Design a protein with these regions (language model features):
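Conserved alpha/beta-hydrolase "acid-adjacent" motif
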Residues: 230-236
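Conserved acidic catalytic loop of the alpha/beta-hydrolase fold
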Residues: 76-93
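Conserved HGGG/HGGXW glycine-rich cap/lid loop of the alpha/beta-hydrolase fold
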Residues: 10-70
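Conserved alpha/beta-hydrolase catalytic His-Asp/Glu region
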Residues: 128-140, 151-215
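Flexible "cap/lid" loop of the alpha/beta hydrolase fold
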Residues: 106-111, 115-155
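Catalytic active-site module of serine/aspartate enzymes centered on a nucleophile-bearing elbow/loop
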Residues: 246-278
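Conserved alpha/beta-hydrolase "nucleophile elbow" surrounding the catalytic nucleophile
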Residues: 31-33, 93, 97-102
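Short beta-strand/loop motif that positions the catalytic acidic residue
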Residues: 217, 223-225, 229
Length: 278
């Protein structure tokens, strides 16, 4: 099983599971909550056939990576990403972060600048800052909402995630083309995650401020968001990114939900491939 050992000392060291396909310029795919690198199946195929080396990995606490008791913060996640890039000796990298994975991309810029990077993409991302505060009135979640979500996950994770998945995919509109089997596949990824990581990452993605990080994300930046996203609404996230990084190129996908890489794969893959080719 291919893994790398984290080296930084911000959290307990652990193994990160990764998969790599194809040859060419590297593209690193960072998954969302509470999934794993397997969420990118449709994109891995498109990218490897287009002549890129594609690396997907599981965040600590998720998929087949190590399940640490602590360390579920974005400083740790971004440092894990840097350790992966260095262990695999990657350079000229395009990093693509989905949902909470957009936080890794943003915080990486804040901590390490543009080291090793060629370009970046934020897909249905939690950036710039989801928490609604006096200084961030356009945030999408009040603190009580965040803690309520954590409590629901802790009380009955399977029940909560069953409902979450249908909102993630806007199932009433998209279920017929994906099929019930896709729900089973998604659930199988959820339950590879540790309960602790599943809970703690809600606080991490909802309560971490990425606004200053985005200002340092100066490589070409693609932002893709669906205007029917029920999980991370466009108005609270993707639409706001250009305020903090004017070089961001925002593409709003009409009628697309949070999980647009699955429901609108053909449209999304074209956007991604066109961007990566630059």
């Amino acid at each position: 099983m291919p893994t790398i050992q984290t080296k930084h000392t911000l959290a307990p060291q652990t193994e990160l599971y990764y998969e790599t396909y194809g040859e060419g310029r590297p593209v690193v795919l960072i998954h969302g909550w509470p999934l794993s690198g397997r969420m990118w199946e449709g994109q891995i195929d498109a990218l490897r056939h287009a002549g890129y080396q594609v690396i997907s990995y599981d965040r600590r606490g998720f998929g087949q990576s190590g399940k640490t008791a602590t360390g579920y913060t974005y400083d740790v996640f971004a440092s894990d990403l840097k350790d992966l890039i260095e262990a695999l000796k990657l350079n000229d990298v395009t990093v693509v972060g989905f949902s909470m994975g957009g936080g890794e991309v943003s915080r990486y810029a804040g901590l390490f600048g543009m080291q090793y990077l060629r370009s970046a993409a934020l897909i249905s991302s939690v950036a710039p800052y989801l928490l609604k505060t006096e200084g961030n009135p356009d945030g999408g979640m009040a603190e009580a909402d965040v803690e309520g979500m954590v409590q629901q996950v802790a009380a009955n994770r399977p029940q909560f995630l069953a409902g979450f998945t249908k909102k993630f995919l806007n199932w009433d509109e998209n279920g017929s083309k994906l099929g019930d089997e896709f729900l089973d596949f998604t659930a199988s990824l959820y339950f590879q995650a540790s309960p602790v990581a599943t809970q703690e990452c809600v606080r991490a993605f909802a309560m971490t401020d990425f606004r200053a990080d985005l200002a340092k994300l100066t490589v070409p930046l693609l932002v893709v968001h669906g205007d029917a996203d029920q999980i991370v609404p466009l108005e609270a996230s993707g639409q706001r990114v250009p305020q903090y990084q004017p070089n961001a190129e925002l593409h709003v996908m009409k009628g697309a939900p949070h999980g647009l890489n699955a429901t609108h794969a053909e449209e999304f893959n074209k956007l991604l491939l066109d961007f990566v080719a630059r």
